[in-house]
Amino acid sequence: LPSASLESVYPPSATRGIQTELTIKGKYLEKALALQFSDPSLKAAPKKDENGEVVPNVFTLDVPKGLALGRYSVAGGGGKFGLSNEKSFVVNDLPELSLSELAESMDSAKEIELGYTVIGFPKASRYGWMRVKLKAGQKVVIESEGSHIDSKFSPCLAVFDQSGRKLKSSTRSDVLI
């Protein structure tokens, strides 16, 4: 008999104190009934449609307000093929902004506010552009956590000024600039 295999959890993070919807993808997850987290206070229930039917592989997660920030593990299953392998899941304290596609040019970059966890999907070997307004001398931290959430994403972060001049960049896999 095959066994359940969890390939991704989206979004890979949630803000503590809120309820969020998670979608899982993988193999042999048909009729997955549960998500099991490394902290039992993270509770997810299968999402139901307007007719009360379970929406396949979609769950509603309640994240307790007092839960410690950090990484947790999650597994999916409970259906015909058992419980899956684990994936990382991050609990943070910043509101989340999901960008289904990142702009491919500086001119078409979406403006975002500071103080958000941005979840985006840059295309391979391409920049995914975002725009933020900063004041001269303002210090900010930009961090990519792709490798912390079981992602194949290997980031290169760069900061440009409005004329397109690169001000700072980093090519490490765990990027902080």
Predicted regions and their residues:
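Predominantly extracellular/luminal regions of secreted and cell-surface proteins
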Residues: 86-114
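Extended acidic/polar, glycine-enriched regions
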Residues: 65-95
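Acidic, Ser/Thr/Pro-rich low-complexity intrinsically disordered segments
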Residues: 2-45, 52-56, 63-65, 69, ...
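A short, sequence-level motif marking secondary-structure junctions
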Residues: 50, 90-95, 173-175
